[in-house]
Amino acid sequence: MERYESLFAQLKERKEGAFVPFVTLGDPGIEQSLKIIDTLIEAGADALELGIPFSDPLADGPTIQNATLRAFAAGVTPAQCFEMLALIRQKHPTIPIGLLMYANLVFNKGIDEFYAECEKVGVDSVLVADVPVEESAPFRQAALRHNVAPIFICPPNADDDLLRQIASYGRGYTYLLSRAGVTGAENRAALPLNHLVAKLKEYNAAPPLQGFGISAPDQVKAAIDAGAAGAISGSAIVKIIEQHINEPEKMLAALKAFVQPMKAATRS
């Protein structure tokens, strides 16, 4: 959990925002997935947002659903995902690692057991996409017991009550939604979020990272100009994996070429 705090402090000192890529663990297979993650970090990722393949991904658009299917086809299990997380943490001791997932995966293991496992492998945060703030108590309590930051989604239409709850319960960072709907790079993010950012700041929320529809450097810059601490990009990255599925080396080169200008856009 402290890794987020030190990251944001360092970025602030360097006058930079955070660029955070999302990928599904095990897509398109364990070995290549680990290479992908190394490449993202080498290209300038400040933190990682990682998905665990799940059979019913509600908030995911087709691009990320396909990533899940590829990981399933490779036979990737949640247990293997945790082994991967331990390897990533060993190799990259300081980068914040977040999980973005669904409640069923937490229930399958048992809530406390799940967060204990996260702590053991070095996961810093968990966002459970299908658990609203008002039902989050057992999750966030277990998370905090195990020094894992509970992450909450702040939708564009959040009212004052919700903003206060997110500020009060969230740690690590706040996932600022560019718009409602499913994820996807086709639907470009285009909402001025200044008012939400100002409110979150007023209520001392964890730093907001803008996600959903972030696929170009100008959007990263716009998010930071609106006061966000950085931006999360998922579908655009997963699409690159899909496009080069049979050319592993080309895939890594294309990912590097995508991430470098996205990170560059965080520097004011």
From Swiss-Prot:
Has UniProt tagged this entry with the keyword Amino-acid biosynthesis?
A: yes
Query: EC?
Result: 4.2.1.20
Q: Which reaction does it catalyse?
A: (1S,2R)-1-C-(indol-3-yl)glycerol 3-phosphate + L-serine = D-glyceraldehyde 3-phosphate + L-tryptophan + H2O
Please give the Gene Ontology molecular function terms for this protein.
Answer: tryptophan synthase activity
Coiled coil (residue ranges): none
Concerning SUPFAM superfamilies, the annotation shows: Ribulose-phoshate binding barrel
Query: Which residues act catalytically here?
Result: 49, 60
What is one term from the GO cellular component aspect held by the record?
A: cytosol
The record, for CDD domains, names:
Tryptophan_synthase_alpha
Could you list this entry's UniProt keywords, alphabetically sorted.
Answer: Amino-acid biosynthesis, Aromatic amino acid biosynthesis, Lyase, Tryptophan biosynthesis
Q: Which family does it belong to?
A: Belongs to the TrpA family.
- Report the NCBIfam families cross-referenced here: trpA
Quaternary assembly:
Tetramer of two alpha and two beta chains.
Query: What's the protein called, per UniProt?
Result: Tryptophan synthase alpha chain
Record gene name: trpA
